[in-house]
Structure formats: C-alpha cells, structure tokens
Curated annotation (Swiss-Prot):
InterPro entries: Ribosomal_uL4, Ribosomal_uL4-like, Ribosomal_uL4_dom_sf. Residues 45-100 are annotated as: Disordered. This is Large ribosomal subunit protein uL4. GO terms for molecular function: rRNA binding; structural constituent of ribosome. One of the primary rRNA binding proteins, this protein initially binds near the 5'-end of the 23S rRNA. It is important during the early stages of 50S assembly. It makes multiple contacts with different domains of the 23S rRNA in the assembled 50S subunit and ribosome. Forms part of the polypeptide exit tunnel. Part of the 50S ribosomal subunit. It comes from Leifsonia xyli subsp. xyli (strain CTCB07). One of its GO terms (biological process) is translation. Belongs to the universal ribosomal protein uL4 family. Gene3D superfamilies: 3.40.1370.10. The gene is rplD. SUPFAM superfamilies: Ribosomal protein L4. Keywords: Ribonucleoprotein, Ribosomal protein, RNA-binding, rRNA-binding. Pfam families: Ribosomal_L4 (PF00573).
Length: 221
C-alpha cells in the first residue's frame, strides 16, 4: 500500500497530498550496497592530481657530495638521494584515476534504498512551490522550510527549469539543491530531510516508473 504525504503551500498549510509508490519509497535498504555505491561516488570525485618527485626528478647535481673516506660521515652518493634534505621521495603518490565502475542497477538500488529509509522515517516532504511571482526570495524559502523541515541539513529537489527556486535556495548554508534527475544516494544520506516540489516529485516518480516499465518490456520481449 502506497504511503501518502501532504503537499503544503507557501503559507505552510496543507494544499493536497501525493502518494509515494512502494516500489520506489518502501524498498529494502541494503546498507552494504549503499556503502559500496557511496564509496565509489566519493572516489570518483577525487582529482587524483597528486604528484611527488623521485630522485630522478628533483633538482641537484649528480656529483658525489663528498669523498668516500676520511670525513667520519656516512658515505653518500648523491644529494638527490631520498635520505638527503631536498632529495627525492620514495614510493610517493603519482597521478591516478580513482573512479570505479559501478553498475547502473546498483546505483539505482542504492538511491531507492536511501530514499525508502528517509520515507519510513517521515523525512520526505512536498511543497507546491518555493516562490511566488517572478522574483527569487530567500526569505520566503527560509520561512517555508522552518515549518516543513527543521533539521540541520536539508536537501531540496527541484525541476531543472525552476531557476527562481534555485536562486532562492542557493544562499542558504543548510540547504543543498538538486534536480530530481540528479538525485543520488550520497546527497540523500547526508541530508536529514528531503523536500520536493510537487512537480519535481511527480517527475521523479514518472521517470522511475517509465524506466521500470521499459525494463520489464525488454525482459518479456
């Protein structure tokens, strides 16, 4: 049985309701799977441009720094040796690509598992819109969110063409905004509450339902 959540207007009053399909918002939350997907996502975000110079790359002459015997010091062959100050680094980091290949089905399952966890905790909300008129208003968004989601970290999910809402929320430190097609397990997990606009939630449900129907047809074909 699908769960329903209230849709509130700009004044924070109930303006309707919308159903959250069990196939999207009440699936198993596989913690090891989510951990693997999020770890891969964070790894892919690394630049991987770290680099140190080995003894063949640091500057310095190739001559022997002092004679082999008679100084009382340990013998040295080069000022570029790793034990010398300013010498090369042994086994230092080199540029590399940290990205991992994660199957699309795993990424999708991790997202739905994270959303289902938030839905079961009554942490998913819906609003009609964040702005009214043709001008962005951060003040209006803050007032609306104060009555909808009072947690420290809030994820706002919008439609891609909702520029007024993006401009209204981008200056709020505790709010992170995404479009519904950018939703991912990591951003859901680091947010205490997820607030959709009604249009964004309907778009997300429609997109996922269409994708599931297409896959079913391919299997039956």
């Amino acid at each position: 049985m699908a769960t329903s959540i209230d849709v509130v207007d700009l004044k924070g009053k109930k303006a309707g309701s919308i159903e959250l399909p069990d196939s999207l918002f009440d699936v198993q939350t596989n913690i090891p799977l989510i951990h693997q997907v999020v770890t891969a996502q964070l790894a892919a975000a690394r630049q991987g441009t770290h680099k140190t110079k080995n003894r063949g790359e640091v500057s310095g002459a190739g001559r022997k720094p002092f004679k082999q015997k008679g100084t009382g010091r340990a013998r040295q062959g080069s000022i570029r040796a790793p034990q010398m100050t300013g010498g090369g680094i042994v086994h230092g980091p080199t540029p590399r690509d940290y990205s991992q290949r994660t199957p699309k089905k795993m990424i999708a399952a991790a997202l739905l598992g994270a959303l289902s966890d938030r839905a079961r905790g009554s942490r998913i909300h819906a609003v009609q819109a964040f702005t009214a008129g043709e001008a962005p208003s951060t003040k209006a968004v803050v007032e609306l969110l104060s009555g909808v989601a009072t947690s420290k970290h809030v994820l706002v999910v919008l439609e891609r063409d909702d520029e007024l809402a993006f401009k209204s929320v981008r200056n709020i430190a505790s709010v992170h905004a995404l479009t519904y097609d950018q939703l991912n397990a990591y951003d859901v997990l680091v947010s205490d509450d997820i607030v959709f606009t009604q249009a964004a939630l309907e778009g997300f449900i429609a997109a996922k339902s269409t994708s599931a129907a297409t896959k079913k047809e391919e299997v039956n074909a």
